[in-house]
């Protein structure tokens, strides 16, 4: 039997997070040495799901203020960032959640190797999802930030959301994440990522 092909997603240029590209909304990026500006890609899509022990709420985020309010009101907040080539959105996430420049660069680097790293008050987990595309095995980057009462996922734009099953479980109350906290949500997202390997093995 012929072996299946394996390939990764296409390589992107790393998003420039320098302050020269600061948006009109006033989100200042972290300082860099002599960064060269690159054109931004399509705007990233930010989906927020917040929950407690009894209910949950979902929305598409348009402003930083929405993230700040959600963090104050809900015990567990998950922000899924779909799109790695939108430096304005990346800077906004860094400002709201106090994510450093090096960690942000890791989050939006498509070829980042899987790893776990602690950045002060946050844990960064770089991983890869696996799927079939025809006869080829395709791996897509996903980066998770675990912080105090929140999880952030950065991932490529994909036709199929690898975490939709997690959303459904939270919507229908089939998890105890609202009681158990953001670390339980992070563990569930990693479980789903790893489970995706079994059909390929």
Task: Please place each PLM-identified region on the residue numbering.
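Peripheral, non-transmembrane regulatory/ligand-interaction domains of membrane transport proteins
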Residues: 1-201
